[in-house]
């Protein structure tokens, strides 16, 4: 709340107009803040209708001075007249462009457009119970459908022979691949595809799996 409040103040100081949904005029559309529950890392995503932020460097400097706890700042461009919050193009204004957090003993990279569970404490319980009920013995071929940044598949990989993770969001797949490398996991493969289509293709090819996780 404090970060958003101060961004509002900076918009006035820098005379940056906010976006009007009805008219389509204005530059500043949204602010998205993501926080690592365990790491405490903070990502601020500024969503603009144009890639040009007036006095960009000074704006970022002023925001960082007010909130030195911010880990990274990303500029996202959404020039479409749409209810969708995020656009396709992004520029990293400060930091790495992503944050990291811990889940079930593994480290995960989270970028602005990647899905991550909003309640990590409950997520650990949920994933633990799902893996327990799956009864993995180390011999199974597992599908992680709609895998996002790879969380459940990477966590389950310790108890499976092979994990096939499928996700349509290409940004999330990039994070998932990085997460596998970050955690030294080599028995997981990632596919950038619709999970339903992918599983039909597997079936048509005569392939099968022992367990499917669907979140």
Residue spans for each PLM region:
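Short helix/loop segment immediately N-terminal to the Walker
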Residues: 17-25, 142
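Rossmann-like S-adenosyl-L-methionine
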Residues: 55-215
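Non-catalytic surface loops within mature trypsin-like serine protease
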Residues: 35, 48-50, 77-79
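Extended interfacial segments that mediate partner engagement and assembly in macromolecular machines
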Residues: 1-20, 33, 38, 53
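Short flexible coil/turn linkers enriched for glycine and charged/polar residues
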Residues: 37-40, 69
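RNA-binding accessory domains that recognize and position tRNA/RNA substrates
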Residues: 29
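Short, aliphatic-rich beta-strand segments
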Residues: 33, 40-49, 107-111, 211
